[in-house]
Amino acid sequence: MHELSLADVPSRIGQELGKSEWITVDQTTIDLFADATHDHQFIHVHPERAAVESPFGGTIAHGFLTLSLLSAMNFSGMPKIREQTMGLNYGLDRVRFMSPVKTGSRVRGRFVLSECQFRGASMLVTTYEVTVEIENENRPALTANWITIIQFDPNDRPKGI
């Protein structure tokens, strides 16, 4: 994985900064997410029933499971910021669940930097236009604007910014 410096980040606005590895969304992952979130709707956890009673032909991942995979996608696909000491979620805007992720599908994230702003002495707030693609599908699973905070040592703040 390549690296960027804090000083380089603003010049990358409008560019795709990363594309993650493919992640397989299997029934075990879906079941564990259902247990963690107490969301046991049949379309997620009952393959036989979902095959008969849902329009999907089987179980599908929770939309929020797909969304939560952004962290893993970030780690596998985004450049490391050299000066970063910690990363934080700040929020999400315009989250849209576009297509269901069928059990056994593979998904990956694409990250386009759309905004960044230095705040205070030690934070860079970034916004990424994120698309989660489903392998061999035309429509994405989801799109969102993901806002993150890159924390860094104040002594590493780029000069003049």
UniProtKB/Swiss-Prot annotation:
Source organism phylogeny: Bacteria, Pseudomonadati, Pseudomonadota, Alphaproteobacteria, Hyphomicrobiales
Originating species: Rhizobium leguminosarum bv. viciae
Originating gene: nodN
Family classification: To the R.meliloti counterpart.
Role description: Involved in the production of the root hair deformation (HAD) factor specifically on medicago.
InterPro entries associated with the record: HotDog_dom_sf, MaoC-like_dom, NodN-like
Keywords: Nodulation, Plasmid
Name of the protein described by the UniProt record: Nodulation protein N
Record-annotated MaoC-like domain positions: 9-133
Transmembrane feature ranges: none
Gene3D superfamilies reported in the protein's UniProt record: Hotdog Thioesterase
